[in-house]
């Protein structure tokens, strides 16, 4: 099949980019022909190795650098252009003989836009992928899903570990298991550990992501062997960058602790993750009970055990022995959980390997893609 992927998010790196790469590579592996549909003058930050089809309707609208006064105008402009892109996509699907369309990152607003355009009457399956439905989003989502239900080729595929937020009366609203993220090379990592044991904390650093309790817990923890912790932070705002550097300076003399203030992209991101033995995720928010955690599924795909807060996709640790849950209520509870997790890995390095192997099998890319395109 020729499968079009409509992408309107411009990102130099991150999970949106890796998700697109995942879809494209798996479609290729299965013998399909993926093509990208993008707005006019779209700047590709990654070479996906596929043809591009340019949509009419204007360029991508970005909020980057916009004042709070300008954002409402940009929001309206984005909605208008989204409808124009969908209208153009309806024509391009026929013009380029596409057999299906995938919109890889959607919200309920995408359904509203769809219903204002000819794309709702597409002659081929159109798949809107939702990366979870939050508790507060459910009513709005289901309202739009009910409106879209009359159009037989519109599929709303929700990546989730739970289906209690969906409705059995809507047969084309389908739960899809989350996929693991793997190295950009497509190679399957192997499980391994080092001495000293290497821990990693990765991702976007913001002021509200308080890492001080973790650092204090690591500083005072009693491990049964040598341990290192790398704290990587990518920062978007100057004040976040200044805070990260100040924290790194304050803790620079802690044995085994190192900091990396950098935005890791592509092979640099892969290497940093592959170099550690386990990943720490001592942060939580209620939304992670409804939205899948891309960082957790990165840890699984890279065969790294994870120490996570209880809110982060609790179904994963319930069903797979890929790490431990961490009480983040105080430095003392973090220290106790960190010691237990690390000492288990030091004393029994293979303790999580079987769980990681099983999770990678169940959350593989083939299963996700089959769930989407087999209608």
PLM regions and their residue ranges:
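Nucleotide-activated donor-dependent transferases that construct or modify glycoconjugates
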Residues: 1-14, 201, 280
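A short, glycine/small-residue-rich beta-strand->loop->alpha-helix junction that serves as a flexible
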Residues: 7-22, 44, 206-209
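A charged, aromatic-enriched C-terminal amphipathic alpha-helix characteristic of glycosyltransferases
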Residues: 14-15, 328-336, 343-375
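A short, active-site helix/loop in glycosyltransferases that binds the activated sugar's phosphate group
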Residues: 134-175
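Conserved donor-binding/catalytic core segment of Leloir-type glycosyltransferases
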Residues: 190-209, 215-219, 229-230
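Glycosyltransferase donor-sugar binding loop
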Residues: 228-244, 262
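Nucleotide-activated donor-binding/catalytic signature segment of Leloir-type glycosyltransferases, i.e.
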Residues: 242-270, 275
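Nucleotide-sugar-dependent
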Residues: 281-297, 309-311, 315-316
């Amino acid at each position: 099949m020729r499968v079009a992927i409509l992408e309107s998010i411009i990102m130099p790196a991150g999970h949106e980019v890796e998700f697109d790469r995942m879809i494209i590579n798996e479609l290729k592996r299965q013998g399909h022909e993926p093509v990208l549909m993008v707005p006019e003058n779209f700047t590709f930050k990654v070479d996906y190795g596929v043809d591009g089809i340019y949509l009419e309707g204007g360029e991508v609208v970005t909020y980057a650098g916009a004042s709070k006064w300008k954002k409402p105008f940009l929001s309206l402009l984005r909605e208008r252009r989204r409808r124009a892109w969908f209208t153009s996509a309806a024509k391009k699907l026929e013009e380029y003989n596409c057999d299906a369309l995938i919109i890889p990152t959607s919200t309920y607003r995408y359904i509203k836009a769809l219903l204002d355009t000819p794309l709702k009457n597409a002659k081929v399956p159109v798949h809107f992928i939702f990366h979870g439905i939050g508790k507060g989003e459910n009513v709005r989502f289901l309202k739009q899903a009910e409106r879209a239900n009359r159009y037989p080729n519109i599929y709303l595929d929700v990546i989730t570990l739970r289906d209690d937020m969906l409705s059995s009366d809507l047969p084309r609203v389908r739960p899809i298991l989350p996929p693991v993220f793997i190295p950009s090379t497509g190679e399957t990592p192997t499980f391994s550990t080092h001495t000293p044991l290497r821990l990693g904390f990765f991702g976007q650093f913001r002021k509200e992501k308080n890492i001080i309790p973790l650092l204090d817990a690591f500083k005072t923890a009693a491990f049964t062997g040598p341990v290192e912790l790398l704290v990587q932070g990518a920062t978007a705002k100057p004040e976040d960058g200044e805070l990260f550097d100040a924290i790194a300076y304050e803790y620079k003399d802690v044995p085994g602790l190192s900091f990396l203030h950098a935005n890791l992209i592509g092979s640099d991101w892969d290497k940093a993750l592959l170099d550690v033995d386990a990943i720490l995720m001592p942060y939580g928010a209620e939304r992670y009970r409804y939205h899948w955690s891309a960082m957790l599924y990165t840890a699984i795909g890279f065969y790294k055990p994870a120490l996570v807060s209880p809110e982060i996709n609790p179904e994963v640790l319930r069903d797979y022995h890929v790490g431990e849950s961490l009480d983040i209520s105080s430095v003392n509870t973090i220290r106790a959980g960190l010691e237990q997790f690390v000492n288990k890995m030091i004393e029994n390095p293979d303790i999580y390997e079987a769980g990681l192997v099983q999770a990678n099998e169940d959350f593989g890319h083939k299963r996700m893609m089959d769930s989407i395109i087999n209608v």
